[in-house]
Amino acid sequence: MTSQLHKKGEAWSARFSEPMSELVKRYTSSVFFDKRLALVDIAGSLAHASMLAAQKIISADDLAAIERGMAQIKGEIERGEFEWQLDLEDVHLNIEARLTALIGDAGKRLHTGRSRNDQVATDIRLWLRGEIDRIGGLLNDLRGALLDLAEQNADTIMPGFTHLQVAQPVTFGHHLLAYVEMFTRDAQRMRDCRTRVNRLPLGAAALAGTSYPIDRHAVAKTLGFDGICANSLDAVSDRDFAIEFTAASALVMTHVSRFSEELVLWMSPRVGFIDIADRFCTGSSIMPQKKNPDVPELARGKTGRVNGHLMALLTLMKGQPLAYNKDNQEDKEPLFDTVDTVADTLRIFAEMVAGITVKPDAMRAAALQGFSTATDLADYLVKRGLPFRDAHEAVAHAVRICDDRGIDLADLTLDEMKQELPNVAHLIGDDVFGYLTLEGSVASRNHPGGTAPDQVRAAIKAARAALGE
């Protein structure tokens, strides 16, 4: 069995006097996870072969044979007919071996002027570029769903919180727009990351470049890269682009996790602000009444998973000298799983948000608790000439009195308010109660970035325009 695992004809077997052990073979093989790079590997190889032919490094007949063989291999992979072999270590050697079996010596010439070091770096960048574009689209879908829900609730009043204590009234639409802003920045980070991903390593070969008269810029143009990696050592050895993407993904998941925490809280019967559609929830095997928000709960958990992948990649790179080291094989599984986790999460969240039922009465009732308009009363006094710190102290005194009596500030009569606040009684008139309503409070925040319904609608319009850019 050992000799079968390390048989003659492998890309590097001639150097060794004894076969590799089966244990080492299985330990070092990557084909069963890096095979997802197969189609981009073929695309990279075709661009490389075309350049080799244009530079007269291989013949036109060789190029035609390579193109014919690769077309057959691509079809086999897409139909699930390709036979992946552990013996052949990785996706690159599996495809090359199959190509050589199909077309003979022309297949052996394909690797002229390149190494698996620059080949895999190119494959990862090609693949990740496409995944960044896909994730960008999914972020847009989620932003769109949030904007739809925000538009429906531009006037829906809820309590805003600090320290999970009622702070000031806001609109639910305004609250949702905060997440739109977060996911907008996430989309910007993804686009920015893409500019550094989209550089061609091919041509760096193993580490020092190649002695063949290659045309790297032609390959970059064929594959849609913005340019080439400027240094061959850097091109094959660094994975900072993957780390950067994973860091951006960790931020995406952090924002999802914050939103998830609120969804779980809002759906709790003790809060009851929203309901999540049944198709996104699960039940209990023992408690018949349960409807559990498993999707947002699981998203919170998966955030830790992506954060872990970021730490794995940072740790992977921190001790590597130049240039390529086998350590870099460990970049793929964290990267692949990060992409899968983020994409799956964004897709399900966009659908889930569209199915949320809002309960405005519960939100309003909660906003009426906790003296949420106390700051408005202080502002009322300030506008009548009282220094803010004095107004703050006076209203805090009034809040303490109302709290002891179990009533809200708005429940005080005008005479009671003046009696309890004798030092500022001369500043208080009948118009004070307009400042103590929830509607008056949110309407007064009528400036860009504020929670006034008109500002919320304007922000939604601007965000929709940004989505179309």
Curated annotation (Swiss-Prot):
Catalytic activity: 2-(N(omega)-L-arginino)succinate = fumarate + L-arginine
Family named by the database record: Belongs to the lyase 1 family. Argininosuccinate lyase subfamily.
Subcellular locations according to the entry: Cytoplasm
Amino-acid biosynthesis in keyword set: yes
Cited InterPro entries: Arg_succ_lyase_C, Argininosuccinate_lyase, Fumarase/histidase_N, Fumarate_lyase_CS, Fumarate_lyase_fam, Fumarate_lyase_N, L-Aspartase-like
GO cellular component, one term: cytosol
UniProt cross-references to HAMAP family, sorted A to Z: Arg_succ_lyase
EC class (word): lyase
Identification of the protein by name: Argininosuccinate lyase
EC number: 4.3.2.1
Keywords from the UniProt entry: Amino-acid biosynthesis, Arginine biosynthesis, Cytoplasm, Lyase
NCBIfam families: argH (TIGR00838)
Main location: cytoplasm
Biological processes, Gene Ontology terms: arginine biosynthetic process via ornithine; L-arginine biosynthetic process
Keyword Nuclease part of the UniProt annotation: no
Pathway: Amino-acid biosynthesis; L-arginine biosynthesis; L-arginine from L-ornithine and carbamoyl phosphate: step 3/3
Record Pfam families: ASL_C2 (PF14698), Lyase_1 (PF00206)
Residue pairs linked by disulfide bridges in the UniProt entry: none
Organism from which the protein derives: Burkholderia vietnamiensis (strain G4 / LMG 22486)
GO terms for MF: argininosuccinate lyase activity
